Amino acid sequence: MLYLSVPELIAEAANFVPAIKDAGVETTFERLSSIQDQVLVVKYGGNAMTDEALQQQFAQDVALLTAMGVPVVVVHGGGPQIDAMLKRVGIEGQFVQGMRVTDADTMGIVDGVLCGNVQGQIVNLINQAGKSYGVRAVGMSGKDGRMVRVKRMHLPDVQNPEIEHDIGLVGEVIGVDTALIENLLDGDFLPVISPIAADDQGVTHNVNADVAAGEIACAMHANKLMLLTNIKGVLDKQGELIANIDSASATALKADGTLYGGMLPKIDSALDAAQRGVGAVHIVDGRVPHVLLQCLLTDADVGTAIRV
C-alpha cells in the first residue's frame, strides 16, 4: 500500500493548523527536518483526554508526526477516569503534593483503568487516525518487558524536606530498560505506555505519568519532552504565563506557594529531564487545538519552556 509523501503529509497538517499553510511547505519542511529521526516523548493527560474533539486532534497530531519521520512515544495519565471509577465504588481520592495516595484497593482500580479502558481508547484513536498513513500504535505498561523498575516512594515535604509522606503504592523510578520501546520504534510502531510498574518483588505500583514520561525521555535520550496540561503552562501568582523557567525560579515559586498540587511533579520531572540532557522540554496547554503540530511545526509560543 502506498502512503502519503512528506510534502503531502505537511499539506494534511496544514488543513488542521492554518499557520502551517501560511508558512508554506519549504519552511515547514525545514522545521520538520530538525526533529525527524529524533525521539519525541509526549505525556498525554488532562482535559485533552476527556474532550472528544481534543482526543481526535491529539491522535491526528501524533499519527502525522510519526508518518513524517518523528519517532513518538506516548506516556498517558488518566486522572479524571480514575477519579470517576473511585467515586463509583465509594473510594475518596486523596493527593499529597500532586501525587495520588494509592492503597491496595486504589492500586487495583488505577491499574484496571489505565491499562484497560484508557490505554485501549488511546491506541484505537491513534490507529484510526493513522491508518491511511501506515501508523500503528501498540499499548503496554511499564511492567511489560520489565521496562520500568520502581521502589516505593517516600515523598519529601515541599516545605520541610526532613518530613516524608508515605503515599502508599506509588513508585519512584529506579531504572528504565528501553529495549522494548526501541524495538517497537524500529518496527515502525508507536508505543503508548501506561505508567504502571513493578518493584523488584513484583509488587505493582502507580507512577505519576509526568514522572514516568520524564524518566523514559531521559533513558531514550529524547530530543524533546512535551508535558500536556490543563492550563496555559506554568503560571505566576497573577495567573500569567511564564514563558521560560529554570531551577532557581521554580524553587522560589514552590517556596511561596505559586506552584502547588499537580504542577509540582510536573515541574520537577521537566527540570530533571532538562538537567539530564533531554534536548528541549516544554509544559504546554493540552486544550489548544492541535497543540503538538503548533509547537513543533510553527513558530507559535505555546506553554512554558524549561531551561537548565
How would you describe each model-predicted region?
Residues 1-287, 294-300, 307-308:
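Nucleotide/pyrophosphate-binding catalytic subdomain
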